[in-house]
């Protein structure tokens, strides 16, 4: 395991903690896409089905459990504890537009036609587009709270660090995972416009608006 993988995991964890902290402190989930959070929970669920059958390391197991817990606690806060503050009128992205093609692609492009492998592949493809409902929500409302933009920044940073991790693994181990790399590149592309706005606006104390034609 190299430093890029560890930093990527920490960035991902920080993003989730920031989001949970924001919801808990404000007792409000306005501006947060519940649909994106459902997709992320689905990503972790289908990816970590091997949690009790395939032990790699304590670090790996702990991170899987933490990500699953954070994902489902976030969904619970949005649709349960603080559901009265949920902005359902603006969280209108049609999930079937993502789920149907991702399911189809998972059956067509995978490494092995087994249940666990197809579900793992599904999780990789789905993660690459799971943020779209959140970006769509921002483009629809015209702006995002600062803490939400920090959450998105660290999610994007996690993806960028994982790309560096794959490059490093290819150099040192001659390891190349085409499905993960291509999906990671696609996901990073979705964040590129956001990164520019984050640096030019948010870091200068301005509110972020994200025009995004869908």
Curated annotation (Swiss-Prot):
* GO MF: ER retention sequence binding; KDEL sequence binding
The subcellular localization recorded is: Endoplasmic reticulum membrane; Golgi apparatus membrane; Cytoplasmic vesicle, COPI-coated vesicle membrane
Q: Which residues lie on this side of the membrane: Lumenal?
A: 1-4, 53-58, 111-116, 169-178
Q: Which UniProt keywords apply?
A: Cytoplasmic vesicle, Endoplasmic reticulum, ER-Golgi transport, Golgi apparatus, Membrane, Protein transport, Receptor, Transmembrane, Transmembrane helix, Transport
Could you tell me which residues belong to the region Interaction with the K-D-E-L motif on target proteins? Answer: 47-48, 159-169
**InterPro entries listed in its UniProt record:** ER_ret_rcpt
Q: Where is this region: Important for recycling of cargo proteins with the sequence motif K-D-E-L from the Golgi to the endoplasmic reticulum?
A: 204-207
Q: Which parts of the chain does the record assign to the membrane side Cytoplasmic?
A: 25-32, 80-92, 136-149, 200-214
Entry's transmembrane regions: 5-24, 33-52, 59-79, 93-110, 117-135, 150-168, 179-199
User: Which terms does the UniProt entry file under GO BP?
Assistant: protein retention in ER lumen; protein transport; retrograde vesicle-mediated transport, Golgi to endoplasmic reticulum
CC per GO annotation = cis-Golgi network; COPI-coated vesicle membrane; endoplasmic reticulum; endoplasmic reticulum membrane; Golgi membrane; transport vesicle
- Membrane topology according to the record: Multi-pass membrane protein
UniProt keyword Endoplasmic reticulum, yes or no: yes
Record-marked site positions (Important for recycling of cargo proteins with the sequence motif K-D-E-L from the Golgi to the endoplasmic reticulum): 193
- Marked site (Interaction with the K-D-E-L motif on target proteins) residue numbers: 5, 117
- Reading the lineage from the top rank, the first entry is Eukaryota
In the record's own words, the domains note is: Binds the C-terminal sequence motif K-D-E-L in a hydrophilic cavity between the transmembrane domains. This triggers a conformation change that exposes a Lys-rich patch on the cytosolic surface of the protein. This patch mediates recycling from the Golgi to the endoplasmic reticulum, probably via COPI vesicles.
Quote the PANTHER family the UniProt record gives: ER LUMEN PROTEIN RETAINING RECEPTOR
Family to which the UniProt record says this protein belongs: Belongs to the ERD2 family.
Q: What does this protein do?
A: Receptor for the C-terminal sequence motif K-D-E-L that is present on endoplasmic reticulum resident proteins and that mediates their recycling from the Golgi back to the endoplasmic reticulum.
This protein is called ER lumen protein-retaining receptor 3
Species, as recorded: Homo sapiens
